[in-house]
């Protein structure tokens, strides 16, 4: 069982079924001090054991048929991963430096649409082998829909993959093309704008610290002047 000195925390983890159902989750290597996974203070006592735990936790979370259990396991796993050194981060500071005088490389962005845990593990493993610099994991609005990967799942799976491969440091996760659908916007601007705002909030709550707002679909090429063509784009983005 996951070890905790807090009885409420132990009860919370037992309610998830971790200690009884998932034999990989054993040993005195994690301490959880509160019953709320999102606010728990997690102490890693055996990093090697935690790395081995990731496969089991991700499988349990992704394939659980209970929505609450899935969410709780994703939150718990994400917090464990952060305590193990995989830190969700914003790439804004690096981009600011690139815009000034730090040149000579690009930042690859990778959209994973399936087998996300396995593919992310491969990416981290190869990045460490070649001593790669920054790279981003992305998922677009459309991909969230047809792959059924909500932001919390995507972030958690990527962070768990980082821990599993022994990666420590910033992990960049981006909402790619959080795009307004033109026909939806023309039909009901407030509803479509509200949907994108809600998706952005969900992504930030899941610790996406990079958001690509895409309202280029609203460009009106029937206008004679370029600025007026682009006005719906830049005004809605703002």
Spans of features found by a protein language model:
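Alpha/beta catalytic barrel-like cores
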Residues: 1-174, 182-192, 208
């Amino acid at each position: 069982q996951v070890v905790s000195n807090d009885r409420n925390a132990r009860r919370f983890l037992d309610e998830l079924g971790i200690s009884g159902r998932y034999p990989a989750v054993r040993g005195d290597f994690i301490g959880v001090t509160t019953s709320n996974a999102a606010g728990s203070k997690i102490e890693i006592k055996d990093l090697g054991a935690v790395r081995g735990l990731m496969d089991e936790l991700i499988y349990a979370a992704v394939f659980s048929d209970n929505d609450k259990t899935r969410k709780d396991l994703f939150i718990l796993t994400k917090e464990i991963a952060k305590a193990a050194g995989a830190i969700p981060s914003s790439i804004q500071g690096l981009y600011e430096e690139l815009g000034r005088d730090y040149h000579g490389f690009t930042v690859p962005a990778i959209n994973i649409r399936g087998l996300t845990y396995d593919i992310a593990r491969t990416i981290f493993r190869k990045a460490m082998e070649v001593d790669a610099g920054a790279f981003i994991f992305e998922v677009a609005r459309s991909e969230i829909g047809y792959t059924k990967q909500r932001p919390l799942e995507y972030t958690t799976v990527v962070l768990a993959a980082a821990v599993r491969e022994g990666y420590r440091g910033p992990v960049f996760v981006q909402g790619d093309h959080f795009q307004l659908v033109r026909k939806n916007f023309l039909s009901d601007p407030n509803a479509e704008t509200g949907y994108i705002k809600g998706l952005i909030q969900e992504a930030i709550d899941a610790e996406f610290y990079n958001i690509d707002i895409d309202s280029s679909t609203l460009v009106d090429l029937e206008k004679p002047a370029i600025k007026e063509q682009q006005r719906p784009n830049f005004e809605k983005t703002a």
